């Protein structure tokens, strides 16, 4: 993903927040709801490996089913150029990278 890229005709990437071993996390604007969100994407070298795509999808599904004030909410999931999920953005908290 690149700064300025629009995903699903809805989410505009504005900033790279950080990266983990298998993924990047970006700050984005949800153009439909006019809110800031975070988008986690699988790194390109894992996209071609189905086991990693499935693992990433399970991560999104599992997190989406959790409901706790200390856990970010998952809003959306999809596969464009790479799998991604959209989650609640919390200002100044990079712990969401480690979901």
Regions found by a protein language model. Name each.
Residues 14-20, 25:
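Protein kinase glycine-rich loop
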Residues 19-20, 66-69:
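Conserved N-lobe motifs of Hanks-type protein kinase catalytic domains
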Residues 29-36:
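Conserved N-lobe loop of protein kinases adjacent to the ATP-binding glycine-rich P-loop
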Residues 43-65:
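AlphaC helix of the eukaryotic protein kinase fold
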Residues 77:
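Activation-segment/catalytic-loop signature of the eukaryotic protein kinase fold
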